[in-house]
Amino acid sequence: MDSTTLLYHLLDEGYKIEALSFDYLQRHRRELDSAKKICELTGVRHELLQIPSLTGSALTFDGDVPHGHYAEESMKATVVPNRNMVMLAHAVSTAIARGFDSVAYGCHAGDHTIYPDCRAEFVEAMRKAFALCDWTEVELLTPFLEWDKGQIARRGAELNVPFELTWTCYEGGKEPCGKCGACVERAEAMASIDAA
């Protein structure tokens, strides 16, 4: 939902886009199929990168996915150590190789509590790293950094994002579980569209 809305937001802003997805043997692999379909729908080039070395989280089958709201301490089990830094490193390398001057990252305020690599301090450190990692400086775009999930959902609704094609559930079944933190937060965000 976040990445798809980010894609539509950047297309609306006039950016030329290529999309990367990452297969880290995550439990919720359905998100990869969703990303492919959405990129086909929008005509955006999509590449799937393999990074199977990420482990140590309920999202990589190292324990059960906790149920409930993200604010709960148990949700820390869904942190994949250093995941976003690894993904951003791959993204900046790909951007430089392909002549892009920016990388977009869909982090948002709703993730700040649980995920250290979605916080402003992390983003600022990555911006500095992007400026120093190569002769070519690459800008890190984070338009949703201070937005909550409801704001992202409402922006997506404005852009006619096909939310029905997106996948959010951490369980990875055939249907969303409706109980994991990702499902709970998505339901609240979607309800905010109707309330607006």
What label would you give each PLM region?
Residues 1-160:
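ATP-dependent adenylation/nucleotidyltransferase module used to activate substrates
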Residues 89, 165-188:
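Local cysteine-cluster metal-coordination motifs and their immediate loop/turn environment
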Residues 111, 190-191:
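Glycine-rich nucleotide phosphate-binding loop and flanking beta-alpha elements
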Residues 172-173, 194-196:
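Short cysteine/histidine-rich metal-coordination sites, predominantly Zn2+-binding motifs
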Residues 187, 193-194:
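Flexible, glycine-/basic-rich loop-and-beta segments that form/coincide
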